[in-house]
Amino acid sequence: MKTITLLIPVYNEESVLPQLFKRLDEFTKNTPNYQFEFLFINDGSTDKSFSIIAEQSKKDSRISYINLSRNFGKEIAMIAGIDHVKSDALVIIDADLQDPPELIQEMISYWEDGYDDIYARRNNRQGETWLKKKTSQWYYRILQKSTNIPIQVDTGDFRLLDRRCIEALQKFRESQRNTKAIFSWIGYKKKEIFYDRDPRLAGQTKWNYRKLLNLAIDGITSFTTAPLRMATIFGFIVSFIAFVWIVYLLVRPLFGVSTGAGYSSLMAVILFLGGVQLLSLGVIGEYVGRIFIETKNRPLYLIEEYHAGNIKKTRR
């Protein structure tokens, strides 16, 4: 019997966990031909999420859990789980039930047809503001334009991955991660399915615009040098315009045209060039900072407690 692990990152989800357990149990009862493991990654929750998971694991032998030593963020929590997956396939799903577990049956069907990465694309994003929807769309399209990788648009982490995709993901050890882009980078045979994303069942979203901005910066700087190239091109254009302007100022007196004091225009040019320089330094600093962090070679995460359920491990 093939084994499938459901990887579920958790951060302060105590209000939704009981309903999640129920939905997962109903799903597995309707999918009897596979052996399932529910691998919960507690990412430093400050509520009762971990104690609820630990208690439920005593009742359900399919539940495994990793309790991280602190909050490392969802990207790191996912790789912590991926590192411990031994099953034939992996499904990544959020704990908030916005992604319906029932859709996994369709993913499994395509997996049996030979697809390696079956990802769910959202028809709609209920419960999200217009601004969040638009900024997400812009981000994916900018990332697509600035890389030579076919980025999957309007998708999250909800997907099924074959064993060889799991082993490929385990090789990525960078600390500044954008897993959604990594899914695209590894390639393999992909299949897109569409679904309507539900609003949160309970609790509040853990994402805010600051976290989304950081994720966007990580994604762009991890997979493309386009910002550096743009800074170079912009610097060349500004330098060329400045050169033409200088030539113009030198030629004007030859035709009897007074140059005038020009303090206002001079200050405007100085401030503009100063802003361009600071922006360029900021872009360079982002890349240098990431190089500095990666060269430290620190562990991506630390585990406080690991509990393995009774699922039969088919890989080593």
Listing of model-derived features with the role each one plays in the protein:
Residues L24, G81, D96, I118, ...:
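Residue-level signature of catalytic and energy-coupling elements of molecular machines
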Residues Y11-S15, Q98, E102, Q170, ...:
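Residues in soluble alpha-helical coiled-coils and helical-bundle/repeat scaffolds
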Residues M1-G127:
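Structured catalytic core of nucleotide-sugar glycosyltransferases
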Residues E26, N30, E55, K59, ...:
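Conserved amphipathic alpha-helical interaction elements at protein-protein interfaces in regulatory
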Residues R62, I66-R70, K74-H84, P100-I182, ...:
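Acceptor/aglycone-binding surface of glycosyltransferases and processive sugar-polymer synthases
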Residues P9, L68-R70, R159, T232, ...:
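Short conserved micro-motifs on helix faces and helix-strand junctions that flank
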Residues N178-R316:
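Hydrophobic helical membrane-anchoring modules
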